[in-house]
């Protein structure tokens, strides 16, 4: 790849101010290294005051960083998940306020709060507790100035990553606590390490708040920055030596955090390799089933057992999306929601799954026994399958079973069976990043199988797949979920034909037409008019290919 293509979109003149910025930041450190008397470095470092200040700084910074993690991590999660309301904006403003305050002002605020005559400190004096001008005050000052950096950095990383994995985990039956420990925390490890390094570095360099609130008592509150400031007038060589130590520690932290992030992301791509020859293709898998592979009950291998399943009636309006519908999806059959982009198909699916709050829209699950209202077990397959990237395919499929309280051993056995039933035997230990899009979708399908849902929601799961992978996925859905309620969003007539679907055509957020796919196609071909043009545009050529395969 040539430089011309590598840097496409960046004007050449940008390099000049960028180089100036680098030099502006780098030259002072070079000057610092040149100015130091390296011969005297060991002697200066061995002096009591310097080693004492360094040890105190490291101890207090570790304590303040731990405090940042303990209270800052929950705060970052709250801020990241909060909706954009006035109170969330106020909360973020208060969190970031210490970042823009002069450190001396921060120290003064701490002093009038926790000092002997402070708002809280005066009451602590009654119990003989004195905080100001102690080592505890140093830790509090460092925490006060570094906590906003920790929270802001971590919150930004969380908001950038998004919470799709958490949404899926919740839909698979995970409690909020299990979701936090099994999904959120593992995925935020690189951001947590980077934020921790940033907080530690900020605490290590704190000066103004410390000297105002804690003073400068040797061995008690005199940290490395304070010692550097005092030595600047007494011994320039000592001040320079301590400065280099400070820079070195910060450099190790930043470099270590970056290296750890790279290692962690590379670990996501690691996994036990498998023999590709053992993994059936979609065509081979379909051939096996066409030969009548079955279990002792006569059901296709991996097919879910027959159970009562509900239909659903959804009615109401969603004014902001111009939706006004009253329609019913029958139980035990495949319903295909079709129409142009913006017709409201995915919106209705989001309402049914609970991902979208629509107060003016209601849906009622109608069970065969006449009962209504009971929430069925629902599984969702999306266009881009949301698998947990830090887990193997086996762990992904076993996840909902573990959430249901099933033992680890039994969950693993059932997960292996589900993966084998969708043609992924031999890939159990691979991670999602190591498999193709079609294999990822089949993994999501296997995860849906172990949940044994009564309702399966499909949001264009075949759209991003190649022809063979899409055909294989259709066949798997048709075979495994026979007799279950399947509601599918699609633009392809071929999908509806392969799954023998009842089609509901939406236009502009309203019901345009519905019926069995064969009936609608026959009507569209025989009486084509403007109202049917949307249906015809979805691909009669694709339909002909599907009919040709029957």
Residues of each region from the PLM?
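A short, proline-enriched helix->beta-strand linker immediately N-terminal to the Walker B motif
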Residues: 450-454
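Conserved beta-strand-loop-alpha-helix hinge in the C-terminal portion
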Residues: 510-541
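Conserved ABC ATPase "signature" region
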Residues: 175, 410-427
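Helical segment within the ABC ATPase nucleotide-binding domain
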Residues: 470-482
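Membrane-water interface segments at the C-terminal ends of transmembrane alpha-helices
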Residues: 5-38, 48-159, 183, 187-208, ...
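Conserved ABC ATPase signature
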Residues: 431-435, 439
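Catalytic Walker B motif of ABC-type/P-loop ATPase nucleotide-binding domains
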Residues: 456-460
